[in-house]
From Swiss-Prot:
GO CC terms in record: large ribosomal subunit
GO molecular function, one term: structural constituent of ribosome
A Pfam family this chain is assigned to: Ribosomal_L32p
Ranges for region Disordered: 1-21
Gene name of the record: rpmF
BP GO terms, sorted: translation
Highest taxon of source: Bacteria
Keyword Transcription part of the UniProt annotation: no
Key words, A-Z: Ribonucleoprotein, Ribosomal protein
UniProt cross-references to InterPro entries, sorted A to Z: Ribosomal_bL32 (IPR002677), Ribosomal_bL32_bact (IPR044957), Ribosomal_zn-bd (IPR011332)
Protein known as: Large ribosomal subunit protein bL32
Length: 59
C-alpha cells in the first residue's frame, strides 16, 4: 500500500483543494412569470415547465 514519503505542507494541500469549492447554482428566469428558477425544473412560483402548466398552484 502506498504511503506518503514526506508530510504535505498546508499550502500544497490547500492549493490542491482550491478546485473543490461549491459553485453558485445557475439560475434562469421562468418563461411564464419571469421568477428566477433552477434550469430543467418546475417553477416553484407558478408551476410551469417547458411552456405548459405542470403543477396547479392554488392562490
Amino acid at each position: 500500500m502506498a504511503v506518503p514519503k514526506k508530510k504535505s505542507s498546508k499550502s500544497k494541500g490547500r492549493s490542491r483543494a482550491a478546485h473543490h469549492a461549491i459553485k453558485a447554482p445557475n439560475l434562469t428566469s421562468c418563461s411564464n412569470c419571469q421568477e428566477p428558477m433552477m434550469p430543467h425544473r418546475v417553477c416553484p412560483k407558478c408551476g410551469w415547465y417547458d411552456g405548459r402548466e405542470v403543477v396547479s398552484m392554488e392562490e
